[in-house]
């Protein structure tokens, strides 16, 4: 009855080709029937993941190779989704560490690798994209070895097997001199090097939930690895959740993975990764145990949120015109639904029923949620992100991030100066022989808010940056990153007029185009000075009977700055909001009327 099982996770930095590699493994193991059309990057299942080329949620799939069932778990490479990573690693016996043949190991690989090594997992290193011009596999392997050594790897972990691969063209090899047409060397390495760590299938059941899914049809679904015993549909189990009293429950369905499909199983046993539903109390770290001999497993920790934002009902004059879901009840229901599967998220009530305090792992984590809500037809406003301050032993502490930037040498000075102003501390600096420099910093998380757009401007789009949470440390100085420029605020409601925008161009750069609908208090551009300025963008040219309309000057407009969700959230100040609807992203002042803003600015001064 017992089948040979291997459980493996894939670790990689964003865009190092992890999801493409899984595509090829699925294809070559014969998972897709000949008549099935295979989309590219099958593991990135939602639109946002495909557009951005990043994996947000850990996903599972399985292949069968030479009679062995291999469960493959895709992990998010981005540190904002690190909450997912740790739990995934608890289900597997080894990891495939995928590194780019040009870039080498990057900080997010470092983040997950540190966790994998600490758990005692022995990695298999896959040097991917060896078909790229400029590939330098030997340099990459040396850097990977140094990284493992820095992260405290054991001698056994440092003696790692290396596979060279091109996921795009679907081949792998043990030596660069070898010829290869397929992924067979990688499959063989998995069978040879991944330990079989199955428990006793005849013992009392023990299974820990490491990941959650939600289906409107069957409710919450728990995903986890069976450590001991067997589980089958209709079985009575005990749910053990930390200090809470044990609860009896009945499993409705047991599903396994076959390719990308979920298939119903008659029975599953120790060593397999399965999904179960029908158990209401299922949650991260919960142990599903035998009714007669319930034994809890050590509880899994989840990364704490480091960034918080206010999500609130849209109160602008255009509220409810573009969105389908606009009330606080609908917002609350959507956030509650997100909490079912998005474990690193926290939602708290505030004194105001229309405002929710949402905390997450970083800017990307929260903007992905906002972008998903926007696409589903939600309309809301959000405030400026703030870091989560903790009190440790009576000292106020803030989150510190490890930041790595890879820039061209001519941009190095500007980037270092900007990071110095944001209270970053340089840890390491390496230059390669190709005119690029890699800088490692420790930086307070609040120093990173708004840094992405500045960084892209300074490096003219050629810079690479990535950051990962390191620890909480005592707050140093105020170090607030105040915006240098003021803003241009519309003083009227109506449609923007080309003539007015043309006249306003000398005052700053615009966010709006002629014909766009505006309202009083909406921010329409960046002022060239450091103060805010109320302007009239809907004022047309005054015509008299002497000056005919035909003798007009040529109106030449500079193209406006295109606002994206991330750039708008990075841009705003404490007294501003981003209005998010399915069709538009607007920036506005919290108080729309000028006299209200003046009164609000006087209140703190009076206090």
Short names for language-model regions:
Residues 1-99, 103, 143, 212-215:
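P-loop NTPase switch module centered on the Walker A-proximal segment
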Residues 3-20, 79, 105-114, 120-122, ...:
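Conserved structured catalytic cores and adjacent interaction surfaces
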Residues 15, 21, 53, 72-74, ...:
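Residue-level signature of catalytic and energy-coupling elements of molecular machines
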Residues 38-40, 151-163, 197-208, 243-257, ...:
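Interdomain boundary/hinge elements
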Residues 122, 132-192:
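Canonical P-loop GTPase G-domain recognition
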Residues 206-309, 319-321, 485, 492-544, ...:
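Conserved nucleotide-binding/hydrolysis modules and their immediate coupling elements
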Residues 257, 262-265, 443, 453-458, ...:
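Long insertion/accessory domains within large nucleic-acid-processing enzymes
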Residues 316-340, 554, 558:
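A short, contiguous, amphipathic alpha-helix enriched in charged residues
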């Amino acid at each position: 009855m017992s089948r040979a099982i291997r459980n493996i996770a894939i670790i990689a930095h964003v865009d190092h080709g992890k999801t493409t590699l899984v595509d090829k493994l699925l294809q070559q193991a014969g998972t897709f029937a000949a008549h099935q059309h295979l989309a590219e990057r099958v593991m990135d299942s939602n639109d946002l993941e495909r557009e951005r080329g990043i994996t947000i949620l850990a996903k599972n799939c399985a292949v069968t190779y030479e009679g062995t069932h291999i469960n493959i778990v895709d992990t998010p490479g981005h540190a904002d989704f690190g909450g997912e990573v740790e739990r995934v690693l608890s289900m597997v016996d080894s990891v495939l560490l995928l590194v780019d043949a040009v870039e080498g190991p990057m900080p997010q690989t470092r983040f997950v690798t540190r966790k994998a090594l600490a758990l005692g997992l022995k990695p298999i290193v896959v040097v991917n994209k060896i078909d790229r011009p400029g590939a330098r596999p030997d340099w990459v392997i040396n850097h990977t070895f140094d990284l493992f050594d820095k992260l405290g790897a054991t001698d056994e972990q440092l003696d790692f097997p290396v596979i060279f691969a091109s996921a795009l063209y679907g081949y792998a090899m043990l030596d660069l001199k070898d010829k290869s047409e397929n992924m067979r060397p990688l499959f063989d390495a998995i069978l040879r090097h991944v330990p079989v760590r199955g428990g006793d299938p005849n013992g009392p059941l023990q299974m820990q939930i490491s990941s959650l899914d939600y289906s409107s049809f069957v409710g919450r679904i728990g995903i986890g690895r069976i450590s001991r015993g067997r589980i089958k549909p209709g079985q009575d189990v005990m749910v053990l959740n930390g200090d809470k009293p044990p609860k009896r429950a009945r499993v409705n369905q047991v599903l396994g993975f076959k390719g990308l499909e979920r298939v119903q199983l008659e029975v599953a046993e120790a060593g397999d990764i399965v999904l179960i539903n029908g158990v209401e109390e299922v949650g991260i770290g919960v142990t599903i145990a035998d009714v007669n001999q319930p034994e809890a497993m050590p509880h899994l920790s989840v990364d704490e949120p480091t960034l918080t934002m206010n999500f609130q009902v849209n109160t602008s004059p255009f509220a409810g015109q573009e969105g389908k879901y606009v009330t606080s009840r609908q917002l609350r229901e959507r956030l509650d639904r997100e909490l079912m599967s998005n474990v690193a998220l926290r939602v708290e009530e505030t004194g105001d029923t229309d405002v929710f305090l949402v905390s997450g792992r970083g800017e990307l984590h929260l903007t992905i949620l906002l972008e998903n809500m926007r696409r589903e037809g939600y309309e809301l406003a959000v405030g400026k992100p703030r870091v989560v301050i903790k009190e440790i032993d009576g000292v106020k502490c803030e989150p510190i991030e490890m930041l790595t930037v890879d820039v061209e040498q001519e941009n190095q000075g500007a980037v270092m100066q900007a990071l110095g102003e944001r209270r970053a501390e340089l840890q390491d600096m390496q230059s390669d022989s190709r005119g690029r420099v890699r800088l490692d910093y420790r930086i307070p998380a609040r120093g990173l808010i708004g840094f992405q757009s500045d960084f892209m401007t300074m490096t003219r789009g050629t810079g690479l940056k990535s950051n990962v949470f390191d620890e909480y440390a005592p707050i140093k100085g105020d170090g607030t990153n105040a915006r240098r420029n003021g803003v241009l605020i519309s003083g009227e409601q109506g449609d923007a007029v080309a003539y007015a925008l043309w006249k306003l161009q000398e005052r700053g750069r615009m966010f709006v185009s002629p014909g766009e609908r505006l309202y009083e208090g909406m921010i329409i551009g960046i002022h060239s000075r450091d103060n805010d300025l109320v302007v009239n963008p809907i004022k047309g040219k005054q015509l008299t009977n002497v000056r005919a309309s035909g003798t007009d000057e040529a109106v030449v407009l500079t193209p406006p700055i295109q606002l994206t969700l991330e750039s708008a959230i990075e841009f705003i100040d404490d007294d501003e909001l981003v209005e998010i609807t399915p069709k538009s992203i607007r920036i506005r002042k919290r108080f729309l009327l000028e006299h209200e803003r003046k009164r609000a600015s006087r209140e703190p001064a009076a206090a």
